[in-house]
Amino acid sequence: MKLPFSGGCSCGAIRYECSAKPLFSWNCHCRDCQRASGSTHCPVLYVPKSALKVTGPEAKHATVHAESGRPVSRGLCTNCGSNLFILADLVPTMQGLWAGSLDDPNIFKPQINVWTRSAPKWSLLDPSMENLDVAPNAEQFQALLDGAA
């Protein structure tokens, strides 16, 4: 992956640039991500917060409790409504980026599908990827981090 990579909202008001490779990436199929994305899942890559530079107005954050029961904060542009960021208390040193906000969405390489028990029957899950019923356990999460290196 060529660094840095960048992205932003639809109207261009908020831009970001990341100087580090993603730590891990996944497609989350929990009901909260379905509602937030208006689709079957939310494609997200997580990067070190320290490697992310954001310019423009501050994103509006709304905190909800995800299907896991844990709080998740989603950041969006107040001008155009584009979903950009995800902050999860489970990974406090990381910033989630919605793959659709990338300037080049083809750099998104999901490693795993999570919360597939909540995926609608009409959802197309990639059979070549690991599909977890819920979120990864500690061992599976460490494997994700090791696999992204």
Task: Please provide the spans of the model-predicted regions.
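A short Gly-Trp-Pro
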Residues: M1-G8, A13-A149
